[in-house]
């Protein structure tokens, strides 16, 4: 009898977890039908490139790893919205914990509260389940680039483990092509990724060629990454190029980068 009662209780909990409005899952958590705005990165890149076309100084807010810490993400967004100087926002990935469509939608709804255009990278958690398909519909390709104020931002998929080495991650053909594509429109470069070199997600068998292709970009200034949930920075390849880590939303810390004609500065914002 006691065992039967336990079974009934577990069954009731399962029903509640499936039907609860607050759950990050619906009945089909990996249903890939995406309602609402799609292809967000391409749409926002057009805005970013237009807004920054003639700017020689830009202010970029960089956030990462919001997962299901929605209140913390909302706090970061509110703080960014109070700063009129921000030109655009970069999210370095891990919008979700499980790659579910509902998680993606909940994150998108909050990011669309930003008063400035934004782009979103794909994190390793965002690849889980049918996350790759949902990300592609909602945001676009997971390797992409854009040019703002004569600076090219290269957004590199480095989530190699999630692809079980079945695809080229990082994609050196993409990097090689981007180094010269639209070369007349940019003089400097910034590389962005979710997982940094030497992390467990990165394909550390290709560290040397990765550094080679990244360093091929004209006047590479710095690199950005998330994944580790901390504020940190490293000169991974001892070549003067600093890789800046951006903290998870739960830490209520993010970075603002100011790019000027003579260089750049960065500030850690603590809420």
What are these regions (language model features)?
Residues 1-8:
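Bacterial N-terminal signal peptides that target proteins for export
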Residues 21-106:
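N-terminal active-site segment of His-dependent metallophosphoesterases
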Residues 62-64, 88-94, 118-124, 190-194, ...:
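Active-site neighborhood of phospho(di)ester-bond hydrolases with catalytic His/Asp-centered motifs
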Residues 67-71, 201-204, 247-250:
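Solvent-exposed loop/turn segments connecting transmembrane beta-strands
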Residues 83, 179-200:
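Short acidic, glycine-rich surface-loop motifs adjacent to enzyme active sites
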